[in-house]
Amino acid sequence: MASKKLHGRDFYNKIGRPKRILAPMVDQSELPWRILARRSGADLCYSPMFHSRLFGESEDYRNKVFSTRTIPEERPLIIQFCGNDPEIMLKAAKIAAPYCDAVDVNLGCPQGIAKKGKYGSFLQENWNLIESIITKLHTELSIPVTAKIRIFPDPQKTLDYAKMILKAGASILAVHGRLREQKGHFTGIADWEQIQMLRKNLPSETVLFANGNILHAQDIDRCIKYTGVDGVLSAEGSLYNPRIFLPPSSPLMTLYPRIDDMCEEYLNIIREFKLESDYSSLSAIKGHLFKLMRPLLSIHTDIRSKLAQGCTPRDFETFPPVVAMLRKRLLECEEKGEINEDKDVKESVKDSMGYPVIPWWRVQPYIRPLEVPLVTKRKPVEVTADEGPVKKKVNASVA
């Protein structure tokens, strides 16, 4: 039995009452990206999702997916595991415990690999197993256990599910306001109504995080105001603009930095901590740069080709030349007048949702066409841009 440890709101208070949080992802919330997120305003970060069996059994796997470097600004940190065996998950969690503040159980992954491996959201029909996993970690780990879930179509079932997980011992419950079927082209709009319902019906001491519909920095505050949650996670939104965690009152040019500056800052973090040869830190570098550069790649296709064909994921030195090429190109565009103050982001120029119009040379959210899976059987809802879950004429979705 583990010694007495903080739980629930006491634990949340101890780690600084985080409100702006980098969500767990598959591969893409690795060490240098977490540092970038923290320097961009994130109060708490999750690790990528790790496979509990492989993490517990294979030192080679651990070295490939997780850096044990001691970096003060890396805390607080929650390490997330997927799996379906309480003993195996406990073994992995005990190995991770010295390097984090809590361990999270992934109950939300909707991907095919999770279905095949019987983990993530594909455990949500097996409440007894979930309860046994949470209870095992809660009673035998030296640090708290948390959980991240998706919602059910029936709000009452979502509430009962949340109560079961909390009763089993979860200190924090992160709720992605989408169904298991809402993924890929069918990501759709996250349901803030259900998250608000959980806040109203769970005990006040419950620490609740929300996930979904975070496109811009101001969406974090809107979500907290609308749902009443303690903190908000951003996954995909943070990949396209790490500054999403900054206070929304920050200058627009700070909230939406130039793409070349953002890419250079990311590469400099890898250099600063001498991670050029760290396998786990380089695994997602090409994907990160593609997302940061997305607004301009359809215009400057040679840069896209250079990044796609001229860069080797595990060879750090192949990436700086692409960023240098990008910087040179933007300087040339400035000289030609294609980039100038008149065309830049302004407080006075808003889109139909009330967000700033961002030019192609600045990082910005990815607007995905909205397709809702038939399984949801929901009617369209309308909400204004200053309250509620971003639904009015929204031709977009983002995690």
Swiss-Prot record:
InterPro entries: Aldolase_TIM, DUS-like_FMN-bd, tRNA_hU_synthase_CS. Belongs to the Dus family. Dus1 subfamily. It is found in: Nucleus; Mitochondrion. Its EC number is 1.3.1.88, 1.3.1.-. GO terms for biological process: mRNA processing. This is tRNA-dihydrouridine(16/17) synthase [NAD(P)(+)]. It comes from Schizosaccharomyces pombe (strain 972 / ATCC 24843) (Fission yeast). The lineage of its organism: Eukaryota, Fungi, Dikarya, Ascomycota, Taphrinomycotina. The active site is at C109 (proton donor). The gene is dus1. The keyword Ligase does not apply. PROSITE patterns: UPF0034. Gene3D superfamilies: Aldolase class I (3.20.20.70). Catalyzes the synthesis of dihydrouridine, a modified base found in the D-loop of most tRNAs. Also able to mediate dihydrouridylation of some mRNAs, thereby affecting their translation. Its cofactor is FMN. Pfam families: Dus. GO terms for cellular component: mitochondrion; nucleus. GO terms for molecular function: flavin adenine dinucleotide binding; mRNA dihydrouridine synthase activity; tRNA dihydrouridine synthase activity; tRNA-dihydrouridine16 synthase activity; tRNA-dihydrouridine17 synthase activity. FMN binds at P24, M25, V26, Q80, K148, H176, N211, G212, N213, A235, E236. It catalyses: 5,6-dihydrouridine(16) in tRNA + NADP(+) = uridine(16) in tRNA + NADPH + H(+); 5,6-dihydrouridine(16) in tRNA + NAD(+) = uridine(16) in tRNA + NADH + H(+); 5,6-dihydrouridine(17) in tRNA + NAD(+) = uridine(17) in tRNA + NADH + H(+); 5,6-dihydrouridine(17) in tRNA + NADP(+) = uridine(17) in tRNA + NADPH + H(+). Keywords: Flavoprotein, FMN, Mitochondrion, mRNA processing, NAD, NADP, Nucleus, Oxidoreductase, tRNA processing. Transmembrane segments: none annotated.
